[in-house]
Amino acid sequence: MGEIEQRPTPGSRLGAPENSGISTLERGQKPPPTPSGKLVSIKIQMLDDTQEAFEVPQRAPGKVLLDAVCNHLNLVEGDYFGLECPDHKKITVWLDLLKPLVKQIRRPKHVVVKFVVKFFPPDHTQLQEELTRYLFALQVKQDLAQGRLTCNDTSAALLISHIVQSEIGDFDEALDREHLAKNKYIPQQDALEDKIVEFHHNHIGQTPAESDFQLLEIARRLEMYGIRLHPAKDREGTKINLAVANTGILVFQGFTKINAFNWAKVRKLSFKRKRFLIKLRPDANSAYQDTLEFLMASRDFCKSFWKICVEHHAFFRLFEEPKPKPKPVLFSRGSSFRFSGRTQKQVLDYVKEGGHKKVQFERKHSKIHSIRSLASQPTELYSEVLEQSQQSASLTFGEGAESPGGQSCQQGKEPKVSPGEPGSHPSPVPRRSPAGNKQADGAASAPTEEEEEVVKDRTQQSKPQPPQPSTGSLTGSPHLSELSVNSQGGVAPANVTLSPNLSPDTKQASPLISPLLNDQACPRTDDEDEGRRKRFPTDKAYFIAKEVSTTERTYLKDLEVITSWFQSAVSKEDAMPEALKSLIFPNFEPLHKFHTNFLKEIEQRLALWEGRSNAQIRDYQRIGDVMLKNIQGMKHLAVHLWKHSEALEALENGIKSSRRLENFCRDFELQKVCYLPLNTFLLRPLHRHMHYKQVLERLCKHHPPSHADFRDCRAALAGITEMVAQLHGTMIKMENFQKLHELKKDLIGIDNLVVPGREFIRLGSLSKLSGKGLQQRMFFLFNDVLLYTSRGLTASNQFKVHGQLPLYGMTIKESEDEWGVPHCLTLRGQRQSIIVAASSRSEMEKWVEDIQMAIDLAEKNSSLAPEFLASSPPDNKSPDEATAADQESEDDLSASRTSLERQAPHRGNTMVHVCWHRNTSVSMVDFSVAVENQLSGNLLRKFKNSNGWQKLWVVFTNFCLFFYKSHQDNHPLASLPLLGYSLTIPTESENIHKDYVFKLHFKSHVYYFRAESEYTFERWMEVIRSATSSASRVHVSSHKESLVY
């Protein structure tokens, strides 16, 4: 081992000039005096598996050793890294930067300390230095080899292909296979060799810096990126793993994330002996504080994990290093541990303010790479592009969610892999660039509360592109953690897995990861946008016709979910009977073919309408003739439309009778392309005709009777009105049928929810008064029964039915004065009474109105009540047992809050989960209104604290905005549920100074959207108001006033 000390430094190996390192101290600070005394030699294993020896005073604090390593590497952003070493009980711990080394490393001659990445930021563009990104890439390579970073074969092959590109340069099949034979990057590498070589061929011309960037771009989307698992058990003794990340504390079962606790929701972390305790902040409408308890192997394991959590919280959430507390005079209680070092905010500010000189370095991965042309290419151009990208990018702490979509992380045991031979990839030593090359202002900003909102992630992984200049980002909310990877029980799967389908053939812009929507695609300046808007025709009819085009694009994509994606999946899996196939697909394919041609005709007419050379030809400036021709054609397709309700019923019956078909459909719903429940797509053709009717009504209202297009528009309106009237009854019946089946998937504890005659009325969140105080429950109102449920801490993310109240004979009254609880109601049934409280007066009034209506219906149809109750969960308790039974259900809830039993994956982006987290409700009437208010088109988006506008393709449906980079994308990149949001017009003080801008805000989360014309602005306001007012029921007539809608 003594030979290690005689090795040349990385700088001398790479031919870099000697330097004295870069100080990481803040301005005005002085380095602590280095303790004098005996020097001790400590061996450090670098990320490339080489070892270096450092002599430091044995009584020096750990920070001295870490600074020595960072100075040796000339590493500016050393705060992301740490030193791992075994303690006296052989437990691997992080070196405490404040404690003397002699107390932490007892036998330094026999200990090898590892220099590794400690803090993984949510976005690798926050790493300012190319050297830092290179070290992160080495960490990813190491995690792959050691089985920590689990992913599917495609992801693994793509990751390795970027590593190979970085190490040996451009594709050469013989050299590739020789290199792969000598270097094992992953245990199952032999099976992936052909795929790795195929992917590597696509990286020709990519520099090592670009390869590192793309490697991190892919890796950061994997669920296990930067995750270190710590074994534990929950209260019930279920074996789980705990981990900590930039977003908060995560819970895993195997390699599958089943829950997460966002930092914003955590009030206190503590440990008592072997018990690790998480105290959550109370809900806004409840004073009850939930404390979760996990049992670890020993006190030392527990304390070690607690320290890691404290450090992650401080590094990612605090603005500056916490000040030490004064030591007690007589007695001390608890651990004195505290975070030491700069926070991420301080690191980003230090780089942004030009606190260092730009560092460049030359890498020489191997002898092969040193003789290839790629190794000699400068990386300054790429660094400049990245720097531009970082100048205006909003930095956010990604929640992950994020969201349903195919899982990329495979389950299984963690394989043990020996590290590569030392010396194969020497540690990098950077060389300095000329003075004055400073980082541009605005390279980074601290995360704001607004930027932490989580939207459901549906990441699309394609071949990543080099970063482009950007102007902002799109995020969503920890308040919506139900839709993220940080959801309790769940934004991913419900747990939203950030598992991209890594297809290198799809060349699209770098996609977003929930909640970060990169602005690297479609950057536009305000001047460019103004120029584009001025070239549009000014006639309102043009924008009405354009709405037909944009919504038709979305409709075709929805049809393709059935005709292309679902049919392709069915053909690969023999899970569907032939009779069901022949009922579904032959009745959708003619519609897809017809509407494909319809869209072409509309777009051709719009192109002529917009063309400068044809601007004066009035015959092109109409759409009524195209609509009339195609609506007449739609009448011949009515036979297929009538079959859709039959297909929906047959599919649900098939799912009920076949477990295999049920699992197949559930797995398909978890794919990113299926962004809504599967049965919703089966009803899309029935809904589409209503939109044609609305468009033609607007055209007829706009055109005077003398207009050339008026007669065609009126004839087309008459035709589509007739079709809508014929299909209306079927549509109402099928919407209720579809909603019952959708709710059935969200509930456990009731198997016979869908019975003839049952109608859904309202669902939403209410607080139920019990012996433990007010506790949040999810209520489901039907025309015969009221169910109340709780959401447990489970992987399935479903709601457990805890009780039912038959409506027949029920009474309802307000009881605020009786119980002293605002917005309180007493529901008194024949067998049981409960007290509930709504979140607001308006919510209470909506529940009272709908419950009373349902009670009246139950009274009128009393002869049906026994049949309905027989189909509900059995409830044979006597009135005397009601109180005890209710108490038992509370105990069940307590157990479910900590039960981490692995169940089948489940969508976590349904309206039930949105209402749970937004503490609101929706009715069947609201769902029917939502069907009539669907819209698609381009919008410009900006944040409250960002400067530029980003162009996005936006689809509004099901109370939710879905965001795409362009209309050609097959699935959304992110989504933002709008229940609970307020819709307003920006005030003068907000300094927007643009036309056609509207604002969406929920608590501290603010988004600005900008339309291209007055008509599209009014349409977006109209449809979004339908979602926001379903929660608030506040209407304002003029959109020019800055008022809540």
From Swiss-Prot:
Kindly list the positions at which Phosphoserine occurs in this protein.
Answer: 20, 23, 340, 373, 389, 403, 418, 427, 433, 510, 514, 833, 872, 878, 889, 896, 899
Q: Which CDD domains match?
A: FERM_B-lobe, FERM_C_FARP1-like, PH1_FARP1-like, PH2_FARP1-like, RhoGEF
User: Record keywords: Metal-binding included?
Assistant: no
Identify the Pfam families for this entry.
Answer: FA, FERM_C, FERM_M, FERM_N, PH, RhoGEF
Compartments annotated for it: namely: Cell membrane; Synapse; Synapse, Synaptosome; Cytoplasm, Cytosol
Quick one: a GO biological-process term for this protein?
A: synapse assembly
Q: Which GO terms describe its molecular function?
A: cytoskeletal protein binding; guanyl-nucleotide exchange factor activity
Domain FERM, by residue range, is 40-320
Listed GO CC annotations: cytoplasmic side of plasma membrane; cytoskeleton; cytosol; dendrite; dendritic spine; filopodium
Q: Domain DH: where?
A: 540-730
* Domain spans labelled PH: 759-856, 932-1029
Output compositional bias ranges, type Polar residues.
Answer: 471-489, 496-511
Q: Where is this region: Disordered?
A: 1-37, 392-534, 866-902
Write down which residues bear the modification named Phosphothreonine: 24, 883
Q: Its function? A: Functions as a guanine nucleotide exchange factor for RAC1. May play a role in semaphorin signaling. Plays a role in the assembly and disassembly of dendritic filopodia, the formation of dendritic spines, regulation of dendrite length and ultimately the formation of synapses.
Describe, as the record does, how this protein assembles with itself and its partners. Interacts with CADM1. Interacts with RAC1.
* Free-text comment on this protein's domains from its UniProt entry: Intramolecular interaction between the DH domain and the PH domains can stabilize the protein in an autoinhibited conformation.
Instruction: State the protein's name.
Output: FERM, ARHGEF and pleckstrin domain-containing protein 1
Which species does this protein come from?
Pongo abelii (Sumatran orangutan)
